[in-house]
Each structure stands twice: as structure tokens, then as C-alpha cells.
């Protein structure tokens, strides 16, 4: 992605720094952050984002069974209540970014503190930006052989 942004290096640098900060800081588990990022990519039909975040999730120990039930997170036993709340917020805000439905907001508050909620919302927002930018730039995932 950052190669595609080479015509504007400052944008590439600031975006990379922001994504790194979201990934490396805070108290929301890395697994949850990656599931949220993956869900955003999936909802926005961003092949590039989905591929990248599937690989990261797998590297964090998320198994294929969990990834295959992401679309059914609300009922799948593969996800904790906290993950379900974060994923419900992801779906709600990716589809309708103006406000969280009260039930989704309540689920977030039942599972996360205020700082963690800000973290989750920032991850949702950043990944929506990245997926839309990636789609607009026409980015596609590289074949696995090219990434090795």
C-alpha cells in the first residue's frame, strides 16, 4: 500500500505512523484489533485489507475456524463477549458511521473501559479509511509466492 502512496511520501509516513500507534498502544488485545480490522476489510470488500489482516490474525494465533466464522460472530462460540461487542460496533459503524445503536453501545460499555472504547472506535475509523483508500487505488493482494 505504501508503495502506491509514494507520490505523496508525507501521507504514507503519517498513515504508517498512525496505524503503528493504533496497533502497538493501548490495552485492547491484538487479536481483537485484528478481528476488527479484518471485519472492516471484509465489509468494504477490500481484498488487499482482508488478505493483510488475515495473515496478521493467523500470526497472532487466530485459527482458520475462527476466521471462517467471522461473518457469524454474533452466534459463533469462537468469539468472546468482548470480541462480539467490538465486532458489532465495527459492523454498525462501517455500515452507518453516524452513531452506534444503543444496544451496541451498551455491549461495548459492558466489556470495555472508556479508553478501550476510544481505541476500538479509532481502529474502526482508521481501517475504514485504509480500506476505502486501498479500493480507490485499486490495490490487490500479492500472490503468496511474491510475499515470501
Predicted regions mapped to residue ranges:
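Hydrophobic alpha-helical segments
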Residues: 1-148
